[in-house]
Amino acid sequence: MSHFFADHDAPLSMLSVKTEYFPQLTDKEQKYAHFMSKASHAGSRVVMRQVSHESEPIFDLILAIHSKLNGKYPEDDITQKQQTGLYLEYVSQFLSNLGNFKSFGDTKFIPRCEVKFFKQLLELAKINPCSSPLTLSPVDVNHEFTSHHLFSTINELIDIGIYHVEEKAALLGFPSQGYTSAYYLGLPVTPEDMALLKEQLFAELAILPENTRINKVGENSFQIWVASENVKNQITETYPSGQITLSNAVTKVEFIFGDHSREMRLVASYLKEAQKFAANDTQKAMLQEYINHFVTGSSQAHKEAQKLWVKDISPVIETNIGFIETYREPSGIIGEFESLVAIQNKERTAKFSSLVNNAEEFISLLPWSKDYEKPIFNPPDFTSLEVLTFTGSGIPAGINIPNYDDVRLKIGFKNVSLGNILSAAAKSSSKHPPSFISQEDRPIFEKYQSDSFEVQVGIHELLGHGSGKLLTEFTDGFNFDKENPPLGLDGKPVSTYYKVGETWGSKFGQLAGPFEECRAEVIAMFLLTNKKILDIFGFHDVESQDKVIYAGYLQMARAGLLALEYWNPKTGKWGQPHMQARFSIMKTFMKHSTDKNFLKLEMNSTNDDFAIKLDKSLIKTAGHECVKDYLKHLHVYKCSGDVEQGSKYFIDRSTVTPDLASLRDIVLSKRLPRRQFIQSNSYIDDNNKVTLKEYDETPQGMLQSFLDREL
């Protein structure tokens, strides 16, 4: 039960751009950033509805308590002070994750404070515990599409929505298997349901499912809820009106428009304001497609916006918005709302530009034939950004988008590294020194961890996600020689490929996320030893290069062990794709290297802690060789669409063996709280100038930032 408790003593960081980066912008750029930021935050409730059915009513409750108490919580004695502190820690983590499931780990978390104390706060705030959660919600929300009504009283919301945990229901996954997912409503949705809808509805009608939710109204009857301001279907040329029957002649489906209608209207209205301050015609056209997408629900409009986004090269204010990453929806096809507004860091961007300019040379070093690479590498935009606003359940250190395979193939993609996230994430808290790093390794690890992480993120995003060609059949032919296919891992021509309409996500499903993250991470490990890349990042002498390499391999070994927290021993289920990937890489170091001394663990005398022992003299030989072998398998399986062998291989490599499973309790006992980020709010003052408001790095600062957003 204790592993479900909210983090205690978590570090909080203000994402500050107020003094260094924001003042460098012109008035026009500041206003563009302001309205894009408003559009971004306007989607916050959408994320909560996607995280869990209880997240949005919990949000309304904790903000109502804070407002009615004027931020003054009971602190009359030591017990009250302690309970208040524990309550605020829960609230801060909830707001940081935009829901009551960890964005990194996909498990529910509950307050450490007593239920009795939580209900005392209701009394102090004069909130009737027997009233409906609907009484706390904004009046213009269409509750047909929200979950407030699932809890008859606020007491029930607290008892069941906030505090109740069951081992399986506390994990995200298919409801039919006992897990939780707010992407689905009505009767429990099964993997077979989603496979059917994927193949016979979305693929056949060429409709992208990212901006939908699924309401199962009967055993063979579904409503597809489409996110749009419009509450009626205004795009009947691409989305059928009324109920249709799928090709199995049994299943009935109907598209229902107007999901998140209030939020989609707000997002679109702020985008219209941002249009007035766009830097160029490409940005204006991109914003118009975004507006079309959010108003009508057209998935194709979002794809058009992403094409224009890729063509908007190196903007001073970088933005992206939409239903983007599909990791958290159990079938891997519906996207979480996500939005980024950030300012380019020109000094850091120069490093990444140099990496881009040499990308073809570095890709040619990867261990496969040119048949598995695009014939021409279109150098993508790669910028380092300082985040002003990020709406989503969690903020990554780097992003490589768009995710549409055909756009990536025919037009390209962009890479962004989020500098202020990267710097904060790599910081060790003085209260929490890094676990499992030996005393002798700690000086190198603490000095070079951040530098090594920056290099890894650069390689991961550009050369990891940016490399490879999916062998694909199109309506007008193949993008490879069908009569003489590339050779597979067994030296024989491959027999699998992506048929018309198939994508990486649709073919590999739930495994696509962790598999691709793993491939990108392994490419980072493979190329981290490259002296030219290290030189680009400012490490010119052999000594500093070797320390960056060692810190990088040490960091990956540690991350793979920390990953055990995100693996459920009862279900065998992984809760986080990046951590499943990192575990498999650590396991590769330990169990698939030709020299068993490459990675070992040294237990302490009481068997309640251990230290990582990584032999730095073996990194460039046995270590690099096992990385190369793993990488070649992952890449060929992905590019050839060999879902059977590829899935079997990756599942085997990421399966937790009994000896490693035995370390999980130690990993949990040493678990460090995850850093939380507080974001500023922007305003236009009486002089028509944009001002930024920043907040204290405390739970109260986090709370106030959300209250000021008026969501």
Curated annotation (Swiss-Prot):
Keywords: Aminopeptidase, Cytoplasm, Hydrolase, Metal-binding, Metalloprotease, Protease, Zinc. It holds the Pfam family Peptidase_M49. Gene3D superfamilies: 3.30.540.30, 3.30.70.2600. It catalyses: Release of an N-terminal dipeptide from a peptide comprising four or more residues, with broad specificity. Also acts on dipeptidyl 2-naphthylamides. One of its GO terms (cellular component) is cytoplasm. Zn(2+) binds at residues 460, 465, 517. Its EC number is 3.4.14.4. The active site is at residue 461. It is found in: Cytoplasm. InterPro entries: Dipeptidyl-peptase3, Peptidase_M49. Its cofactor is Zn(2+). It is an enzyme of class 3 (hydrolase). The keyword Protease applies. Coiled coil: none annotated. Present with 3260 molecules/cell in log phase SD medium. Belongs to the peptidase M49 family. PANTHER family: DIPEPTIDYL PEPTIDASE 3, DIPEPTIDYL PEPTIDASE III-RELATED. This is Probable dipeptidyl peptidase 3. The lineage of its organism: Eukaryota, Fungi, Dikarya, Ascomycota, Saccharomycotina.
